[in-house]
Amino acid sequence: MSLSDKELFELNKKAVTEGFKIKPRINYNTVGGVNGPLVILDNVKFPRYNEIVNLTLPDGSVRQGQVLEVRGTKAIVQVFEGTSGIDVKKTRVEFTGENLKIPVSEDMLGRIFDGSGRPIDKGPKIFAEDYLDINGSPINPYARIYPEEMISTGVSAIDTMNSIARGQKIPIFSASGLPHNEIAAQICRQAGLVRPTKDVHDGHEENFSIVFAAMGVNLETSRFFKQDFEENGSLERTTLFLNLANDPTIERIITPRLALTTAEFLAYQTERHVLTILTDMSSYADALREVSAAREEVPGRRGYPGYMYTDLSTIYERAGRVEGRNGSITQVPILTMPNDDITHPIPDLTGYITEGQIFIDRQLHNRGIYPPINVLPSLSRLMKSAIGEGMTRKDHGDVSNQLYAKYAIGKDAAAMKAVVGEEALSTEDKLSLEFLEKFEKNFISQGAYENRSIFESLDLAWSLLRIYPKELLNRISPKILEELYGRDREQDDDEDEDEEDPDKSGDKLIDA
């Protein structure tokens, strides 16, 4: 039986390529133009969306890009390292046939990388345990576990009143000139689990890791983070990704995805509890706007693309816990609100996706209070599942509610005092003013290197609430009030007596 030429060709092709997984790649010299961070390619065959492209420049240097759009035989590629120096006639382009992947390993802990995932700490390259797609894999909603157990940050205003659950995503809303970098560094230094519960098999400190990604930061901020982590020893459990302000803007689009892919490997394959901090998401959104403008897309609010909500969700929704895995990813993105405007599209859309917010206040900062966290507009929607008996303390929820109520009343009393004067205030209003002053001075304010446990913060909260008579503490259950209010009052009296008479020694009651 004779075979046709076509059949013979197919048999020869199969014999030659059998056992080979690598397909031949085609190089193109068909760069049609350059527009901002984008390169337009002509006459290319079968380009794929999100495919990685290698561009070889005339000087021999190689840059990576990603296919953003395909129109027939044309492809639009965003170049991560920028398009300066790309010669339209002499640049060669190679399609790899793969999505962008990052080599991951436990050895990434203690290392510093640039915004594209290359080591910049003079250490060796990562010996990869696996190569993972930076876009991640969608998690089956049915496989997700509700976030529980509290992560302690050592900051009273966060731990007591806006507790963060393991697996939660909660942003920090800041503004230009406010100390969000210092707060982020403090959280990295001090973060850890409060106490392991029955499903946390391994709660020791080595099992808690941090992935930190900075986008568009200046050299001074970059040096601050590197030096701070190295000096206090937290670098050993931290992986840093640093995209500087003078790095290509387009690189900021992949930096948070590299960080989250690393976090997913540490959480779901090595079963660690990972805290992921992303700063500054406003720089990321600006990079998104730049690409959108270069593609001449119809702009949305303030010039940002209409798909920014969807794009942000592909980052924020990669936090959480998964059934059958002990690890978790808790996300704390930080964003600066342009002109302190909370209605700006970036904080507005972020607030829809995430589970609360921590609000950094300029007025508190101007009065010298650090950290300047305004607890009234702050919120943690999953706090109820992270606190209480067995996780923190049984009085945690009631104390938090009472602090919120009394702080709001104190703010109203301060506004009234500005109008009618202190003489016209009632006794309760004067107590509220005293509470307001001590709450901001002693509770919210703390040192940058002061690490308060949740139990110390709750004890401090009780000492402030004792300014009021028991009858005015109406947000705390009578049972808890009866158990803790009187005993704390006696302890305070003992401490006052000891201050008056240093030689006097007596037994002190231990706080619950």
UniProtKB/Swiss-Prot annotation:
Residues 484-512 are annotated as: Disordered. Disruption phenotype: Results in the inability to grow at alcaline pH and altered resistance to calcium, osmotic stress, cold temperature, antifungal drugs and growth on non-fermentable carbon sources. Leads also to unability to fully assemble the V-ATPase at the vacuolar membrane and impairs its proton transport and ATPase activities. Finally, leads to autophagy defect and avirulence in a Caenorhabditis elegans infection model. GO terms for molecular function: ATP binding; proton-transporting ATPase activity, rotational mechanism. The keyword Membrane applies. One of its GO terms (cellular component) is plasma membrane. Residues 491-502 have a biased composition (Acidic residues). Keywords: ATP-binding, Autophagy, Hydrogen ion transport, Ion transport, Membrane, Nucleotide-binding, Transport, Vacuole, Virulence. The record marks 378 as: Required for activity. GO terms for biological process: ATP metabolic process; autophagy; vacuolar acidification. InterPro entries: ATP-synt_VA_C, ATPase_a/bsu_AS, ATPase_F1/V1/A1_a/bsu_N, ATPase_F1/V1/A1_a/bsu_nucl-bd, ATPase_V1-cplx_bsu, P-loop_NTPase, V-ATPase_su_B/beta. ATP binds at residue 381. It is found in: Vacuole membrane. It is a peripheral membrane protein. Residues 503-512 have a biased composition (Basic and acidic residues). Pfam families: ATP-synt_ab (PF00006), ATP-synt_ab_N (PF02874), ATP-synt_VA_C (PF22919). V-ATPase is a heteromultimeric enzyme composed of a peripheral catalytic V1 complex (components A to H) attached to an integral membrane V0 proton pore complex (components: a, c, c', c'', d, e, f and VOA1). Belongs to the ATPase alpha/beta chains family. Non-catalytic subunit of the V1 complex of vacuolar(H+)-ATPase (V-ATPase), a multisubunit enzyme composed of a peripheral complex (V1) that hydrolyzes ATP and a membrane integral complex (V0) that translocates protons. Plays an important role in resistance to several stresses, as well as in autophagy and virulence. This is V-type proton ATPase subunit B. The gene is VMA2.
